[in-house]
Amino acid sequence: MAKSSSLNVRVVEGRALPAKDVSGSSDPYCLVKVDDEVVARTATVWRSLGPFWGEEYTVHLPLDFHQLAFYVLDEDTVGHDDIIGKISLSREAITADPRGIDSWINLSRVDPDAEVQGEICLSVQMLEDGQGRCLRCHVLQARDLAPRDISGTSDPFARVFWGSQSLETSTIKKTRFPHWDEVLELREMPGAPSPLRVELWDWDMVGKNDFLGMVEFSPKTLQQKPPKGWFRLLPFPRAEEDSGGNLGALRVKVRLIEDRVLPSQCYQPLMELLMESVQGPAEEDTASPLALLEELTLGDCRQDLATKLVKLFLGRGLAGRFLDYLTRREVARTMDPNTLFRSNSLASKSMEQFMKLVGMPYLHEVLKPVISRVFEEKKYMELDPCKMDLGRTRRISFKGALSEEQMRETSLGLLTGYLGPIVDAIVGSVGRCPPAMRLAFKQLHRRVEERFPQAEHQDVKYLAISGFLFLRFFAPAILTPKLFDLRDQHADPQTSRSLLLLAKAVQSIGNLGQQLGQGKELWMAPLHPFLLQCVSRVRDFLDRLVDVDGDEAGVPARALFPPSAIVREGYLLKRKEEPAGLATRFAFKKRYVWLSGETLSFSKSPEWQMCHSIPVSHIRAVERVDEGAFQLPHVMQVVTQDGTGALHTTYLQCKNVNELNQWLSALRKASAPNPNKLAACHPGAFRSARWTCCLQAERSAAGCSRTHSAVTLGDWSDPLDPDAEAQTVYRQLLLGRDQLRLKLLEDSNMDTTLEADTGACPEVLARQRAATARLLEVLADLDRAHEEFQQQERGKAALGPLGP
């Protein structure tokens, strides 16, 4: 039985932060760390003591993580950033409420002695001889210690305490991965049994030594099960210092989702029930398991369920049938065509998530060039007279302020200058739209046309498609490019306003111009002639989009997009593993990098032919590199294995921590199915005849730090996992099991007289009872399977580890 763990984290906003700049303000941003590893960084909000971020992350994690921390810092253009405060949430605190955490939490002061990380490897023995008892502590090594020196390393030594006695190991200079391999022996002194405490310290020539962490073992543990193995370092026990709100507060939302995923055969009955649902008629179907699942799902859970169901049916090659089933149900119960797909129904959410899962490479290809132009050119555009800054031109030139009419004309020209290429890219993208999306739109077009064939409703079939493609896909991506991975950072206020105007225009085009002049925003009127010109082109585009032959048989199952599709691309600095004769700063060369499901490729620019590529199947590890390795930040390594079994390392430097995390995540996901992954690697580099991390002199020395292949950011490129998706559906059904039982009881007690009075069909009621009973039976079987596997786990845990 596999286990999965993921954190949904939303950094909402801060309030009452202290001023760190001479201007009386701060430039705050937030770092999100899991077990001392940075997994995300928010955008910087300039000149604010009450910043709003609204950034959301899904982090897939190993099951043994311990702590989630938020650090709020003030960005400085010169020197180091100032730390404002932090919030620490233990795993236990997060899981205390199944709904997670959603609250304001006061920031606390960052205590250097509490900022510990890493592990120590020990072997302890209790010996007895003629002179009494003796404790032998074999201090082997430590890994991933906190950097305490300006060089990004430490000078660690261990100090062992037992009773009133203490001994120290030697000090190993300039490493976070020390190897001592020293045995310390302490004689038991008269008195009560004493605990064993091992402390790690960073030796400093000037000033006091810095604390690196400690472990402690009770006398009972020493006697019954002497410690042997790796142990997580902890800070000194102390009460959490409450700042009383003096450092401000942070509003966060955190939810931990942990699941035990059973073997595939356990979910087969549930899968068969769901697959059967999409095979039959849907217009009046209230009896299928899928219809019951939709009925049981509340609005706040609908999006997550829609995502899992779409992935589930994609994995079986039946996503089109699933969407068609929901579409038929939605269309059949819609009386007014103006309200079609306007609610957040399961059908609407499923189509929306389907587009995000299947169409993100397509979206990037269509919109990214123009979105990049908007960010880079930073043109001022405004049509609303109430928001126009007429004095802006006076501040940046000597020509004086523009009149309102001049500002409107200038802004209109700029807007149409961006909208034109956007519309051109969209209407010219028929051949690039994924076949699965085109087939889904074709089905949608046909179902709506069959339901509303009247002449006065001839636009409804177009509006149904454009409502998804334009209003729920293109327009939101233009409005918030970062959420669709089109940009690494949120837009500044001026660019954000420009994007809002463009998104409004694209929405109006998606509505086929039907609402132009009817809303409150009459200041958009100067743009209406251009928008109306685009409407006829969009109609023609939609006709060509749904003019596609074939069915789902031609769409590969268990894949969101072809293996050759580009998952991530951009400029990085690249360095080969081989020693370079040049200085380090010249060894990294600027390269354009593409990542697909098949290869990691490099060239000098996007227009050049690829000059080098690495098969993704050869990747064995993707990890961060310590800053001290090359005296450079944001470096990662890609470790590959050739046909002879030899390992090779490619180093890549990113612009910032967010770009680093995104590339790490993308590479780890792409290489997730690879066999023979490395359990450990070197976070340093082999330079000057030794590893910079652990100081070992052999290039072939075993890695000194654990790899983190399970730590990834959740996004549209997540691989399909049908068993995990089925587990989520099972969990959702569990929440509604009482309702299912009540429904079965009501249907069983309903007599034929009541059936006649209510107009209910006996055959429909019989199918409802059968479907409800089958669902409850499947849930009971899955309950038993989970209990059996948990009993097996408890049995294995009781036996204890078989080795060190």
Curated annotation (Swiss-Prot):
Q: Which residues bind Zn(2+)?
A: H682, C693, C694, C704
Residues the record lists as binding Ca(2+) 1: D21, D27, D74, D76
Entry annotated with the keyword Calcium: yes
Cofactor(s) recorded for this entry are: Ca(2+)
**Statement: the UniProt record of this protein carries the keyword Transcription regulation:** no
Q: Which Pfam families match?
A: BTK (PF00779), C2 (PF00168), PH (PF00169), RasGAP (PF00616)
Query: A GO biological process this protein is involved in?
Result: intracellular signal transduction
Q: Which keywords belong to this entry?
A: Calcium, Differentiation, GTPase activation, Metal-binding, Repeat, Zinc, Zinc-finger
Task: Identify the residues that bind Ca(2+) 4.
Answer: D149, D202, D204, D210
Query: Can you give the residue ranges of the C2 domain?
Result: 1-105, 116-231
Q: Where are the zinc fingers (Btk-type)?
A: 674-710
* Gene Ontology MF term list: GTPase activator activity; phospholipid binding; zinc ion binding
An example Gene Ontology cellular component term from the record?
Answer: cytosol
Q: What does this protein do?
A: Probable inhibitory regulator of the Ras-cyclic AMP pathway. Plays a role in dendrite formation by melanocytes.
- Could you tell me what this protein is called? RasGAP-activating-like protein 1
